[in-house]
Amino acid sequence: MGPLTFTDVAIKFSLEEWQFLDTAQQNLYRDVMLENYRNLVFLGVGVSKPDLITCLEQGKEPWNMKRHKMVAKPPVVCSHFAQDLWPEQGIKDSFQKVILRSYGKYGHDNLQLRKGCESVDECKMHKGGYDELKQCLTTTPSKIFQCDKYVKVFHKFSSSNSQKIRHTGNNSFKCKECGKSFCMLSHLTKHERNHTRVNCYKCEECGKAFSVPSKLNNHKRIHTGEKPYKCEECGKAFNVSSSLNNHKRIHTGEKPYKCEECGKTFNMFSSLNNHKRIHTGEKPYKCKECGKAFNVFSSLNNHKRIHTGEKPYKCEECGKAFNQPSHLATHKRIHTGEKLYKCEECGKAFSQSSHITTHKRIHTGEKPYKCEECGKAFKVSVHLTTHKRIHTGEKPYKCEECGKAFNQSSALTTHKIIHTGERPYKCKQCGKGFSQSSTLTKHKIIHTKEKPYKCEECGKAFNQYSTLNKHKIIHAREKPYKCEECGKAFNKSSILNRHKIIHTKEKSQTLKM
């Protein structure tokens, strides 16, 4: 087999055939031919620019108009070719009247496609040619390109019309293996290989296998850290070219994929597909272990790690591992001290967006999560979930080391440090380590000299809340407010005022007597 050329991927029309296409079909043809040429150049195929491409780039017709005369509109092709080949009417018309007509000259005796049917007998003559073509189309996916020129052209035209077919909304090609439907035969063919292919390309680093070498090569970059695709705008690099293309839309603001249901737009087609499931309620990704279903494949993968216990994302700073990359990214901020999310009300900053959302409720006083058992309300849903365990007595978090159980996962995590002796929260000022982040926060106040806890009674300030509570006891013992009437002393002015009422009543009773 010779090297690939532009001729192998090009479709040519005569003036007669070109005039038979409508404007949309002509524009589609231009786009497909230009795309095919660009793909060859991208693949490094040494091709000189064909005259056809030059014409199309300049917006000219794909031939020399002076060499052709206007001809009458051709007759309709035999009715047998209007059955079952393509369910979409637009594609059916285009293929029947143009593509088969164009390739009839290759000499297939039974396919007299340049001649329209004028009688029943003549129509019967074409029946044999149609049956043979139809048989080719129903062959196995691996053999479809071994059929004659007619089937090859048939497949090429289906691919070139992929965008047009998508707009019809018809999914007419169904996979017999899993029932999934496709709007294009080529997409079904590609999908069916997933059922038959063996993952024979194995990663030597981790053992993961892939069906095609290109996917293995992309995967290897996870281990090597290679990111050959760099954004010229901001310098960010990616290990897959498609990721770079998607990233570029951040700079351009382009969101070409629109939801017909609610009008929301997206910069990735996959994001639109995932979004649509919000409207349909579809959850196609099901966990075989527990039956839980998800609307996004990545969510299923993350969920599976609950069963396997896998935690592939490890912190280089302290060695702690996580089952999701987002959890690792959040954790890293403990070490860096980075706080991206700032409250506009008071200026306080947080390392997680969920934390600032919760914090804002301090200012608004909102407590949307209410306990049906006792009526107590909470700012955060997880606090309500934890609170409910007081009523149920549930303690689902058990220490494997000593068997002690807890009603909060955070309490178990804190408890485990007793066994490990780990102190992951380190003070950058003096190097002292702590087992809990809250303890580190309290410790930092020693260096800042900050005293946020103020006594309302005397105005004295303290750096710890517990110290303030101890101080308050002093005021409880003191009794600076003395009654002038009887000499009795009190530690609060409000109590003294209530006491004075006793003397007022006594005086009024004396006057009555």
UniProtKB/Swiss-Prot annotation:
The keyword Lyase does not apply. A zinc finger (C2H2-type) spans 173-195, 201-223, 229-251, 257-279, 285-307, 313-335, 341-363, 369-391, 397-419, 425-447, 453-475, 481-503. The keyword Membrane does not apply. Keywords: DNA-binding, Metal-binding, Nucleus, Repeat, Transcription, Transcription regulation, Zinc, Zinc-finger. Transmembrane segments: none annotated. It is found in: Nucleus. Residues 4-75 form the KRAB domain. Pfam families: KRAB, zf-C2H2, zf-H2C2_2. GO terms for biological process: regulation of DNA-templated transcription. InterPro entries: KRAB, KRAB_dom_sf, Znf_C2H2_sf, Znf_C2H2_type. Disulfide bonds: none annotated. Its main location: nucleus. GO terms for cellular component: nucleus. One of its GO terms (molecular function) is zinc ion binding. Belongs to the krueppel C2H2-type zinc-finger protein family. May be involved in transcriptional regulation. This is Zinc finger protein 723. It comes from Homo sapiens (Human). The gene is ZNF723.
